């Protein structure tokens, strides 16, 4: 491995953590494992106990055990069949034998009886007696046993009761060290039960302060919820550092079929071909009754309505084959069924949807009015009110009443008709069809869902919206019913056998930012949340993993300043020394020295990444498998490498690479895990060391010369500063121009009135290929030129768009368009699509939208709650719009232009002007890549002109300087913005009227550096260094040789 030292980051002794220790997973000073936690000794004992009682524990059960043994409360996120109940009972018995009190709560008496029998069997297998150890209570036990139970209640080490007993007798129960709740929904139905659980754990409610006080004596383990949690459940997060989450998992393996026919004959045909296990969803209760009456004589079928629920049990027992109900989001058949063996397929008779009519306008919620405003934003009156729509709700209502009968907004995923708008209800469809495909310990059962709809316009809109959820419908003609039925049965056979022992394993998934962590967790359901030492962790079950998603908050270490040669031990091996990053929360200063207060402002309000490293270690130790999903570049690779080293001994560490934050991309990345690429890491190590060495050495020279410790020098920023200075000097030279406004002409002339002769020399039509999609430098240039954003602002906005899943990764020099990108473009462009790959194939891709959604679509779908994003402002939508238009234009047919070339004669001079006078085509409409001007009249004219003295050349804009950096090979996509921002930050340049002007300080610093250290900061040397970095990335150059050359060069600076 790459030699490295992490200063004071050994988890065992607190001293340095070195390469050999990382490789061996051992602290050499203490001779102990790097990932040994206090609970591990008890864990070993518990695992042996569990083997005796139950059998070999699953990986996820070991993770739960570690949490409980260190007294952490949590919601157990896991699919059916993993063994939550058996674990809860075995852990209770284990802790009871250690003298701890445990309470196990079930929703029904039957489950209490079963649990009591099971735990006795466990005790028997473990060879321990249960007399006076276990007490259980339910409504069916004789009165004398009940009395005996109540008398000995506080003496039992394990108490097993129903939720109802908790409600009535919690004061007699006493305190507990471990509470296991088998069905948290039963607890949450009565909110006071939450208070009672907290009391049992050692908290109490202070009437004076009106708040909960105390500390948890024990820990709580609950299942995830299926119903609404209610406000009381928030107390779990406040007091026990976890949030329950939902067991509604959106991982699905469903074959979705759309049929433009909702006749009874079509429905009957599906039921006949697929056999038993169908759920039929009707729009309304009346329609459900009609379907039932039509089918009851032909099929063994039942119906579930608000008043008829008896057929549900018959279906469970197999006495009937199919159930009919209504497609309502909170309905019994949509949310209340969890029968993986029985339910094989679903049929929706009619698309789930909700309608808004003109008559509804006055009664609509402000949120719904706002949503309709975004849908009808093409109406000028509404567009004008959108920026402050909340303050004009009543006015918008009146406008909507006028336009809903006339206007037809362009939205493929919504049906707009005269006087009504129909929104497809995908949420209900996903929940209902999800009953056919359930996650269990052995994987995911397969299901099928048929969507029958007569209204072709509504069906088309439904299919369009489904794409936003990665649901692709096929037609019924494409379905092989025999094969489908066999696959449905085979997956249920696997469920019944449950042969795969440990198919679903816990995994820690680390990304850079909290936004990205939240976004990823939302793709797969409503996560349970755990707060561990300040780190927020989102827990979600998937087909192969129970993922714990959390953020590293960028780099966790940086080069130290006070050891070796500016943070590098030079002993022939060049070993970088890294320390945790400290950041002052008050002034923002970042440092690596081991100190409690900020060296700049003295504040003790300092964030130390050490706490995150420790939390990640604990999580990695729990999961025993780590996936690092940091950004797909050298910086992301370096973060992954550091985490792999710092989490040494806690489990295998793999890298997930994805270029967009979408559900599809995350799933693909998790299927294609790889090792950390050390060549990319070496390149980053060399780049950072080079930046440190040249920066520190030359900065110290500047400090001495200018007596200003705020100054800095860098190899890349210095030539860029030189270009800005040179261009500024050139801009001082002036020239006279005559502006003829009537003809939109600018001529090199100094007369205010003169004769002008214009001749048409040539006229031609051309087909122009659209510009390629954005790379980092072209995006930065256009955002500065068109939107007037600084490069720093653009990169920040692009980062947030990427993390929210709206665009692909924004640090790239590739124009390549992937197959996915081309599919997105084809879907949006239709017949205008031609498709271009642009760049060479490879890992990186251009900057593009992740869905075929315009800016207006994105804003509307955010309002509707279909897209869940955070903190977007008008700037985000403006940049997204630019990226979207440029990308879609790049995939269009060539556009046609008409070019006219003119000869212009005036006062004995001749000038030529070629101008585009017309442009047409979809590509031009999307992105105006050419400047269209009016045709010039031909003939001789007496004209008046405005004479101005202007610079021969103008100072650079940020847009132009970025393009120049790209052309001259200075900087990389990840550093363009940093280089420019640093020039502003050091006050070497300022911006006036959008142009970069060097300050006197900037000019003096540049001249000093060029005069004394030209060879170190020259453009050629900087470009050569960039090419060497690229060679290291490709594995063509030894990074130690590069460091050796750099070191010799730096040491020659006097």
UniProtKB/Swiss-Prot annotation:
Subunit and partners: Monomer.
Motif DEAD box positions after renumbering to this chain: 182-185
Temperature dependency: Optimum temperature is 80 degrees Celsius for positive supercoiling. Optimum temperature is 80 degrees Celsius for relaxation of negative supercoils.
Annotated cofactor note: Binds 2 zinc ions per subunit.
GO terms (BP aspect): DNA topological change
Lineage: Archaea, Methanobacteriati, Methanobacteriota, Archaeoglobi, Archaeoglobales
Record key words, sorted: ATP-binding, Cytoplasm, Disulfide bond, DNA-binding, Isomerase, Magnesium, Metal-binding, Nucleotide-binding, Repeat, Topoisomerase, Zinc, Zinc-finger
Organism: Archaeoglobus fulgidus (strain ATCC 49558 / DSM 4304 / JCM 9628 / NBRC 100126 / VC-16)
Protein name in UniProt: Reverse gyrase
